[in-house]
């Protein structure tokens, strides 16, 4: 029995001293799937005023039933969440960034998660951007 315990202890000691493999050099490189998802999540709008674009994002999210958690105009960042139907136990979270581009347009990226999993369905983003476009158009007409 003592010999067996000594062998097990020695094996554990050697296993504890083993070096983990070095991280891959492309660890932070985006995959093709991530690039495709990013293209679904991003749209350019003909709005020169960043504040107006952020107000449009907030209005759109509220119209879609989201509760705004944070809105940071200097960073162009809006986060929101809502409970998902039909059971209202699942949570949908959205983070939207608004960045100005050199040509006077705004680049809007929406990132949605459903129960801590990224939403990859194109229709979700198409519906959001269609609603945002309507909101921005109405906002422009009211001025």
Per-range role (PLM):
Residues 13-16:
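C-terminal motif of bacterial Sec signal peptides marking the signal peptidase cleavage site
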Residues 18-143:
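Ser/Thr-rich, low-complexity intrinsically disordered terminal regions
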Residues 1-7:
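Bacterial N-terminal signal peptides that target proteins for export
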